[in-house]
A protein has these predicted regions:
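A short beta-alpha structural unit
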Residues: 17-21, 263-265, 299-311, 347-351, ...
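Acidic-enriched catalytic cores of C-N bond-cleaving enzymes acting on peptides and small amides
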Residues: 179, 196-201, 220-250, 270-345, ...
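Single conserved hydrophobic/aromatic residue that forms the stacking wall/gate
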Residues: 412-421
Length: 421
């Protein structure tokens, strides 16, 4: 704790640390909402919670600055609750365990919640600071952003008013976001009748873990491996060359997180077991080479398990594995006018197969509506050809960059001395 509290600026990091101690996964925000309301009361600013679960602060202008434009500071209170498989953590009740690792602040075995805890911490620092000179300030801390922006969608017209809105859900210090991708969820489902396994076969549990994962919007262009896509590559080969059958598949656990772990159970003829085990080792080495310096913690293992009674039928298995193998994933293209910025991408987030049911979830993002639709249509075609029922949901529009925005030009002018220093 002491390490984090000593980081600069201390008035922001102290609030971020306090946020790590309040459970706040999407859908379970009662504790953080109560905490933020109490903070606002103690800071002496008007504070209330609206019907959508958003927290709003209003701070009057410094005397003499009442005629300045009203600035709205916006962030979201919820976090993505993702953990390593071996980590024991209850996101609804347990505090996070943050620590300093070199130049980074991390959490032990879980996501850190800096998205968007740092934005909320910055708002808290501004709200309690009595030395700042400012015009009228409004803070909007939204609920359940990570699962569908429900707080933002539920905000009623007239609840807040202002002239300039600054979104604090960004990544790097000294950088400004001047656009934002829209998004849409795609869910493909299928029910099937299981078939009995061959009693002469051997069952193997194949586990992929140790990947970096990450946020499927911010980090989609960082080259991180997708556990579901790697597993599809493995299965494609052992089905073709080792007569493998598929019993179950469980990969990823959050729609907006790049999957870092995946586990399948397969059966193979006894004569193929050693070949499959050797191929597992080969795959790990190939992937270590492909993702050198990126996925240094990758682990791909297999172990014998008891033979399950049932499995996925051959035709269904082939269709599912082929669709997941072929599904577009990662960056589609960058913004033509801002070449280093991702415009359109998708994340093959979760795969669940077993017990007569299959479900695949993909989240597509783009700052251009036509490209978002193009990408999702390609993905939908993939799974439709596999006989799956595909539903799109939760769509929201993107925000195309305006490099001539007056607010942007003002911020560039203000930050010029800092950037030159």
């Amino acid at each position: 704790m002491s390490e984090i509290l000593s980081l600069a600026p201390q008035n922001v990091w102290k609030h971020f640390y306090s946020l790590t101690q309040i459970p706040r996964p999407s859908g379970h925000l009662e504790k953080i909402q109560a905490f933020l309301l109490e903070f606002g009361k103690n800071a002496g600013v008007e504070s209330f919670q609206d019907e959508a679960g958003n927290i709003i602060y209003r701070k009057p202008a410094t005397p003499g600055m009442e005629d300045c434009k009203t600035v709205i500071l916006q962030a979201h209170m919820d976090m993505v609750p993702q953990k390593n498989k071996e980590t024991v953590h209850d996101f609804v009740n347990d505090p996070l365990q943050p620590y300093v690792d070199g130049e980074w602040v991390k959490a032990k075995g879980t996501t850190l919640g800096s998205d968007n805890g740092m934005g909320v911490a910055a708002i808290m620092a501004v709200m309690e600071d009595k030395t700042l000179k400012h015009g009228p300030l409004v803070a909007l801390i939204t609920a359940d952003e990570e699962t569908g922006m429900y707080g933002a969608f539920g905000l009623k017209p007239g609840t807040i008013e202002g002239d300039i809105l600054l979104n604090l859900d960004s990544e790097d210090e000294g950088e400004l976001y001047i656009g934002c991708a829209g998004g849409e969820d795609l869910t493909a489902t299928l029910e099937y009748k299981e078939e009995p396994t061959d009693p002469e076969d051997v069952a193997l549990k194949v586990t992929l873990k140790g990947l970096r994962g990450g946020h499927s919007g911010i980090q989609i262009g960082w080259g991180h491996a997708n556990a579901n896509k790697l597993m599809a590559r493995f299965l494609n080969q052992v089905i073709t060359y080792d007569e493998a059958c598929l019993v179950s598949w469980e990969g990823g656990n959050m729609r907006n997180a790049i999957p870092r772990e995946c586990e399948v159970v397969i059966t193979v003829p006894a004569t193929e077991v050693e070949d499959v085990l050797a191929f597992v080792g080969e795959c790990e080495q190939v992937w270590r080479d492909e993702f050198a310096t990126i996925e240094e913690g990758i682990s791909f293992t297999a172990e014998r398990v008891d033979l399950p009674a049932t499995m996925v039928p051959e035709e269904i298995r082939d269709n599912l594995v082929d669709a997941i193998f072929a599904c577009p994933n990662g960056v589609e293209r960058f913004i033509p006018t801002i070449p280093d910025t991702v415009e359109t991408s998708s994340n093959l987030a979760t795969v669940e197969i077993g017990g007569g049911k299959a479900a695949v979830k993909v989240l597509t993002r783009s700052s251009r509506e036509s490209m978002k639709d193009y990408r999702n249509t390609a993905i939908e075609s993939c799974f439709s050809m596999a006989g799956m029922h595909v539903v799109r949901s939760g769509g929201y529009s993107g925000w195309e960059p305006n490099v001539n925005s007056p607010i942007l030009l003002s911020l560039i002018h203000i930050s010029e001395p800092t950037r030159q220093a």
